[in-house]
Amino acid sequence: MNHFELFGLPSQFKLDGSLLSSQFRELQKRFHPDNFATASERDRLMAVQKAAQINDAYQILKQPISRAEYLLAEKGIEIRGEQQTMQDPMFLMEQMELREELEEIADSSDPESALFDFDSKVSKMYKQHLASVEKELDNSLWPEAADRVRKLKFIAKLKNEIELVEDKLLG
């Protein structure tokens, strides 16, 4: 049983987050180890394993990047934890330029405003790539979706770096 089946959801990138959450809470209640306190040791162990499976599946499905990676893995394309280098030099150049721009924000005349504008630009880029990966997955364009997910991971890392700069500026 795959993660989507576990939650009674269609195996697709786009999903209803509130339905996922409610299914998660329902499964948590049903398979909570406390419910099996008087059961046999084997049944208690199975309940603990099922609860762990539910938690792992939920963590994967609730995040767009890990959900896309999971869908790709289901199709035999494993990119989770891979060390493959990005093959798109234009994208890599853009990422380097964005990181340089982020480094220069602290020295700007209005760093908070500059960071807000920069964050908006990167968030827009992230949303565009998410929309593209959804289309690619829906159309079974697995290699294209895998490349897009790799790019999304770069952008997500940049978003985390923005948060660190924001913490420094406001901290």
Predicted segments, located by residue:
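C-terminal accessory/regulatory regions appended to core domains
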Residues: 1-171
